[in-house]
Amino acid sequence: QDLDHVFMRF
């Protein structure tokens, strides 16, 4: 999933 990417974006 892209959950990891969502957090990395912050």
From Swiss-Prot:
Name of the molecule in the record: Myosuppressin
GO biological process: neuropeptide signaling pathway
Post-translational modifications: Occurs in three forms: Rhopr-MS has unmodified Gln-1 and Met-8, Pyro-Rhopr-MS has pyroglutamate at Gln-1 and unmodified Met-8, Pyro-ox-Rhopr-MS has pyroglutamate at Gln-1 and oxidation at Met-8.
Chief location: secreted
Modification Pyrrolidone carboxylic acid occurs at: 1
Lineage of source species: Eukaryota, Metazoa, Ecdysozoa, Arthropoda, Hexapoda
GO cellular component: extracellular region
Keyword annotations from UniProtKB, A to Z: Amidation, Neuropeptide, Oxidation, Pyrrolidone carboxylic acid, Secreted
Residues where Methionine sulfoxide is found: 8
Organism encoding this protein: Rhodnius prolixus (Triatomid bug)
Protein task: Myoinhibiting neuropeptide.
